[in-house]
Amino acid sequence: MERIIECVPNFSEGRNMEVIGAIVAAIEKSGGVKVLDVDPGEATNRTVVTFVGSPEAVVEAAFQGVKKAGELIDMRQHHGAHPRSGATDVLPLIPISGMTLEECAELARKLAERIYNELEIPCYCYESAAQKPERKNLAVCRAGEYEALPEKMGDPDRMPDFGPGHYTERAAQAGATNVGARDFLIAVNYNLNTTSTRRANAIAFDVREKGRPKREGNPITGKIVKDENGKTVMIPGTLKGCKAIGWFIDEYGIAQVSMNITDINTTPLHIAFDEVCRAAQARGLRVTGTEIVGLVPKRTLIEAGRYFLEKQQRSTGIAEEEIMKIAVKSMGLDDLKPFNPAEKVIEYLIQDEKEAAAKERLVRMTCKGFAYETASESPAPGGGSISAYMGALGAALGTMVANLSSHKAGWDARWKEFSDWADKGQNVMSRLIALVDEDTAAFDKIMAAIGMPKGSDEEKAARAAALEAATLYATEVPLKTMKTSLEVFPIVKAMATEGNPASVSDAGVGALAARSAVLGAQMNVRINAAGLADREAAERLCAEAAEIAAAAIAAEAEVLEIVNGKL
């Protein structure tokens, strides 16, 4: 899974577009990130910037943004409606994919330390990056705002996590930055078949974590109950990590439950949806659809699609696009307007389409086009890419049998067994599909190295080193194809043994394809290893390939014995 995080810094400038533009330019110039949104506010005198990328790229871009803001914004001249403590007020890191919240918290702490060490801007760490329990709450870190810094920076209990221990001229100019880590927040509105804001609010109070005030007697008009400290006693709602209210939207002519899900691990979108549906039904209403505000991580929709498929007792081992369609239809994401994942899913939005098309040049072809490309006078794609594709087809056949078996009449009780096998097949197939283009890319690296200049001794040395590295890579890729194709056999064996008897021949063909993939890729390992100057590495790779080939031959024989016994 690709490692992606998001950063949403809030800069204390919302009116001077030249300053805002310079900060955004510094973020983009660092490279490797995509700016998704720039939202300046005149009244707040504050701009919220959203950008995403790899952890390393995002951290560097965040640092450059803080640096530029610290150069251009003078907090002594700043006034705005929003609480703030520095030129860069808050700087949260948010995991999107392939990263945990704790990993983001560690990055945030290191970033805060770097900001102070290199820029002399004091930093507090908040939320999951907090180094003191009370500082999990941003309000504690920002208490008194910028104006309180002279006092706070000399107070051992309130001084920044990274700072000099006293007020400085740099702090006077740039203030203090609050660096944190938090989970992704999903903003979502649930459409109701009513115009009543009061009823929408009732549902919101039923489900939101805060709940509703406890009352004496009548739950609507009764006197609010207070505790011994005079604080309102609340009846908690049913969803943790959720804030919600009800409102009426003139544009749509309906009421909605508007919700922020602040902890998507505790309460995923699909669980919140089902609970709002339950609460609405209990009050005689229906949820007619869902409106996602802003963007969501891909996993949010994948998890939702899988959840609704499992509720139907249907196999989840289907294509990612199909799982997303189930999520969209199940929650009515297209109720008010068309829902396009390419515009709403972060991972899709940041994907460079030209780069993706180049990376997937072969697998995006038609079957006919791929065959003609292979048959052309170009040396690539060759046996390595074809081996990977044969392996992918073997996995596809095993997955097909699993999916057919999962909803076979009379086998309803076994749907989960076959769904799990289909999931495994999809995983293996997707990795082998990626290897189709990777194998050709590895060959291209060899050709590029061969084409390097070789006039001087330095050029010869550089060319030799590049050629050795490219040849090693071109040997390791087909070895990866062998290892991955070997994973097809447990799937097709299980399907030959337990799957739909009418599809047993498909499981057999899957085994034949997987064996061909392994043995074909082995030939590529051997021919490329022959070009390695490092003979020890060459012998090691060839020996490993031989073991995998032997295992594949044996596994194929087992599957074919089962298949032939049933034909």
Model regions and ranges:
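Long, contiguous binding/interaction regions
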Residues: 1-365, 369, 376, 454, ...
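Amphipathic alpha-helix face/heptad-repeat signature
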Residues: 389-393, 421, 428-435, 474-484, ...
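Amphipathic, well-ordered alpha-helical segments in soluble domains
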Residues: 65, 370, 396-400, 435, ...
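Polytopic transmembrane helical bundles with strong interfacial aromatic enrichment
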Residues: 357-366, 372, 480, 487, ...
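A structural-propensity feature for long, helix-poor, extended segments
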Residues: 407-453, 548-557
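Amphipathic alpha-helical interface segments
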Residues: 184-186, 439-512, 516, 528
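Conserved phosphate/anionic-ligand binding catalytic regions in large, soluble enzymes, centered on
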Residues: 7-9, 80, 85-92, 263, ...
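Preference for long, well-ordered alpha-helical segments
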Residues: 111, 121-125, 134-137, 488, ...
